Structure formats: C-alpha cells, structure tokens
C-alpha cells in the first residue's frame, strides 16, 4: 500500500519540532489536504497542537510501550479518510529508551513505517558547522532516509544561505526551507512543558499565522514530493486493538475533559468507543453533575494544580463523584485524576485546596520534577482494568507527591531499575471499584484494558 507520509525529526529537544510540525500541518490543511497527524512517544501536549492544526485527532506512536504490530495498527487506524500522514518526532532523531536498548526513538518509528525524514536543525548558534551535524545524522544509521533539512532560528536570510550551502555541499542533503528567529513564533511553556490547547487563548490564530509564515519560507511542494515518493507501507497487521467493525454501544463512560484534565491517548478513547462504550464528556471545573445513565468514569491527567481553586469550589461536582464512587461505579483516574481523588492539592505556593477525599493523603506539588520515564509494572491486585499478574507498560511524568496511603496497591514496578519492587497505584472503594495511579497507560499495550473497563461499566449500567 502506498500512502504519502513524512517524519519531522529534530537533532535534539527544542529544535522546533512542534512549532514546525503544527505550522506545516496547518499549511497542508489550508491547501485542502486531510492530514493524519501523529506524535512519537508518550507526550500528551504536542498532540493537542497537531489536533488543532489538522482539525483531526492526533495519535501517539510509541515503539517502547507498544509492540511493532500494535504501533503499526494505531498508525493505520489514524489513516482513515486522510490523504497524507505527518509524524512529529520526539527529542533528537536517535534518542529513545536508552543507549543500550532499542525502542521509543523517532528513528526506529521512521524505520518501522518506511517513512522519509525531514531533519530540523536549530542554527541559532552556528553556521557551516550545521553541515557536520547533518552529515553525522545521515551516517549514524544508513537505514534512515533523511530526505531533506529545515533550518530553524535563522538570524537572517544570509545566515540561512550560509548554512544551506554548507549542508548541500558537505552532507549532500537538500535544504528545503527555514524559519527566521522570531519570539512571536514561540509556543508558551509551563512546568510540564508547552501550554495545553485545552487552556484556550489565541492558539488557533497563532497556528494559522505560523502556517502563513511557513508557506513563505519552506518549500511545501518539495515536502509533498518527498512524502509521495515514500516506499510502500509495511503490511497492515491483523486487527487486535480495534475491531474491524465497531461494536454497538453497550454502556456509557463519562470522560473528564477541560482545562484541568486533557491527557488522553486518542487510541484509548477510540478503543473504548470501538469496543462498545459511548463516551460522554464532562467538565469537573464547570459542570455541576455527571452525564446521565453512565456506567463508568475516566479521569485522565492534566493540570489540576493550575485549576485547583476552581475544582475545589465546585462542590456539586465533588459530591456527585463521591456518591458515584460510594455507589460502586467504576472510576479510573490517572496522574492528575489521582490528585483530584486525593484529600487536597497543595500548590507551588503551599496553598491547600480540598478535593474529593476518596484517596487518603494530600497531593503536594514539588519544586522539581518528582518522577519521569517509561515504566513496566505487574498488576499486584485485580482491579477494574486488569487481573493480577498482568504485565503493563506505561509512562510516568509528575511534579506532585502523594504519601502512600494504607490502601490496596494496584501495581508492582518492574522497571526502571531504581524503582523495582515499589508499589504504584491504589485500589479503593467499598467494592474496589476505584483505580487511581500516576502511571499513564496506553491501552494498546493490552486491548483487554479497554474491554475490561467496558465490561465492568456495563455491569453497573447497560444501555
């Protein structure tokens, strides 16, 4: 199967991948293309920009959390009704789980998808030396097709031309455009990285202006040519994560989605929907009650610490959720969702805001990142998603710390080495119907995660 596709990779973090990927996606959409956008790795924030730019949900591609077949199935799933695929990389092109073990790198994903790569180089502090960087990236792994280069943070057109000529002369790689250094093209950041698109603001205008700028200095026709000349796609795997025909809804699951909670892998939502759950979105910040006739609740990660005052003040929603838990409704909460279920959130200024109190203890924001990285875990006790003994893969990234309450642990950590044997996650509720954890799970690691959530939600409320 032939399908136009391109990978936008950087030589490092802060190369401008999200800026250029979002602007390029929007520029392609303005030309009438239906872009299937993807983000390499476990990040939640960048996919929001690609979703906004493409007006279509962005999927994460992760070759460490997912098997080759599962990752490829997610890729094919995202191609439906699209005419070109754009994949934004993660960190530098060759950066992955570790230097000794493959997995998770942009290069590996490009190789698995047989996709050409456009390499981004931030030239703000160099000139001809940019050629050495490109040459090194080309030679490190000849299996990776670096088909072109985009230069970011050029000081002037003359600066760009100096770098372009050196790269094309010494690295024999075409340079297909640039972006000038411009503080107005910088996406705002906070402690977890870029600001989320769920926080509103003028991001749509920002992305459209970015697309206009990219049209003027980057050869998009050349990018389309590279994408169309990509070799045939690898064979489509047999369906495992998504049924060939979506199931009719058998239950409703309420999904928290607003400024406080927006971290969901699109594949998780699609798997729930395709296997028989009607998803009903609600806002713990703004709504006073849950959607009607639901059988389960899914509260993802996000920035509850930023919206702590609003979450704390919304007593009707807190009362509704507390009652749902007491009634035995299955509730799954990840990271920010876990914080919402705790007694209170203590923010960076040491101000405490009362939360649901389903989970004993206070979630305290730390002055530095508390834990980060890929994680492998064994299910220690049966819960609403998985059975004891099941092995799962996920990602942890949080600034808060919650003292371990005296509740039944959900998982035992198997990886990374410094956390082996530690407990992670909590099973609470009179009927052990609530699962809360800092571990972000991609349901593609095991399709039974989605199926089990649907089954137990159906037992609580059938439609």
UniProtKB/Swiss-Prot annotation:
Catalyzed reaction equations: cob(II)yrinate + 2 L-glutamine + 2 ATP + 2 H2O = cob(II)yrinate a,c diamide + 2 L-glutamate + 2 ADP + 2 phosphate + 2 H(+)
Single GO term (MF): cobyrinic acid a,c-diamide synthase activity
UniProt site positions, description: Increases nucleophilicity of active site Cys: 440
Annotated CDD domains: CobB_N (cd05388), GATase1_CobB (cd03130)
InterPro entries documented for this protein: CbiA/CobB_synth, Class_I_gatase-like, CobQ/CobB/MinD/ParA_Nub-bd_dom, GATase_3, P-loop_NTPase
Active-site residue list: 335
Enzyme class: ligase
PROSITE patterns reported in the protein's UniProt record: GATASE_COBBQ
Listed GO biological process terms: cobalamin biosynthetic process
E.C. code: 6.3.5.11
One Pfam family it belongs to: CbiA
Cofactor(s) for this UniProt protein: Mg(2+)
Keywords, in A-Z order: ATP-binding, Glutamine amidotransferase, Ligase, Magnesium, Nucleotide-binding
Occurrences of domain GATase cobBQ-type (ranges): 252-448
Domain notes: Comprises of two domains. The C-terminal domain contains the binding site for glutamine and catalyzes the hydrolysis of this substrate to glutamate and ammonia. The N-terminal domain is anticipated to bind ATP and cobyrinate and catalyzes the ultimate synthesis of the diamide product. The ammonia produced via the glutaminase domain is probably translocated to the adjacent domain via a molecular tunnel, where it reacts with an activated intermediate.
Annotated family: Belongs to the CobB/CbiA family.
PANTHER family documented for this protein: COBYRINATE A,C-DIAMIDE SYNTHASE
Note: The a and c carboxylates of cobyrinate are activated for nucleophilic attack via formation of a phosphorylated intermediate by ATP. CbiA catalyzes first the amidation of the c-carboxylate, and then that of the a-carboxylate.
Described function: Catalyzes the ATP-dependent amidation of the two carboxylate groups at positions a and c of cobyrinate, using either L-glutamine or ammonia as the nitrogen source.
Protein name: Cobyrinate a,c-diamide synthase
Source species of the chain: Dehalococcoides mccartyi (strain CBDB1)
Gene: cbiA
